[in-house]
Amino acid sequence: LLLRLLAASEGRVFYQGEEITDASGARLNQLRRELQIIFQDPFASLNPRMTVEQIVGEPLWLHQNMKKADRQYRVAELLKTVGLPAAWAGRYPHEFSGGQRQRIGIARALASGPKLLLGDEPVSALDVSVQAQVVNLLESLKHQLGLTMVIVAHGLAVIRHMSDRVAVMYLGQIVELATVDEIFDAPLHPYTQALIASAPQMQPGVERDAPLLQGDLPNPASPPSGCRFHTRCPYVTDECRQVEPINQVLDGGRQVACHRWQEINRDRSVIQIAPPSAAFLRRRALFEHAATHSSLPSRNS
């Protein structure tokens, strides 16, 4: 919708304070030069009948009417920028690996000199061994070229590595918006807390109980009334079932859409994402028993 590849059925799209929902003609062409996308599947997003030079050079011809010699030079520069030899410009997509194809897709997205780059799950279709390389490339390009990037992803590691601000969505609605550190270290919304707590821990022997979500994911085409998360939320009330929460803006521009976020987070540190583990509760019980009795209970008590 942001790139106008699909028309919005409702709502409005704003870019730099300007509504672009119905942009057309010359303005739409300008927007498509400024807004580019890295598609999710590098095996489907490149035309198998076109060479790399044609794929990367097409935006240069469409948006800048660049002559062939100049296009060839610019394509060589772009390939070097994404870590590919310029000599590969005459090859076809089937001659490359998935990671190399995604680099070609990134070079094509950069060709028009965009101001904003949208990454639609840019590494999810790649092998894990290649994902880190592409993520590091995008991070480097962001700083090198001064790009604004919008990354759509479900991988928490990718989000934490690449993001400055994070919007957490559930059934098509933003439930929390905050800096990356706030989201990962001190989530406020129950869904965000469950999401972060679900990440595997890399500390052997350390127990961490995630708040389990009950029920199945509702049909996005027919979302529940009130708060869309209420069918799975452990803190649900009648208000949650009936009244849709608004985004409450907190200090620093942080936003959370939850009726009970203050109550939920009042009596505990929001940095502690999961409830205390069973092992922790057992140790605390032993400590409290020792404080009031002369001897500790046995292991079988």
Regions found by a protein language model. Name each.
Residues 4, 115-208:
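P-loop NTP-binding/switch modules centered on Walker-like glycine-rich loops
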Residues 11-19:
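Conserved ABC transporter NBD signature motif
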Residues 19, 69-87, 196-197:
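Conserved ABC ATPase "signature" region
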Residues 20-36, 54, 62, 68, ...:
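ABC ATPase NBD coupling module
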Residues 33, 94, 112, 136:
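Conserved signature/switch motifs of ABC ATPase nucleotide-binding domains
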Residues 92-96, 100:
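Conserved ABC ATPase signature
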Residues 177-287:
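Short catalytic/signature loops enriched in Gly
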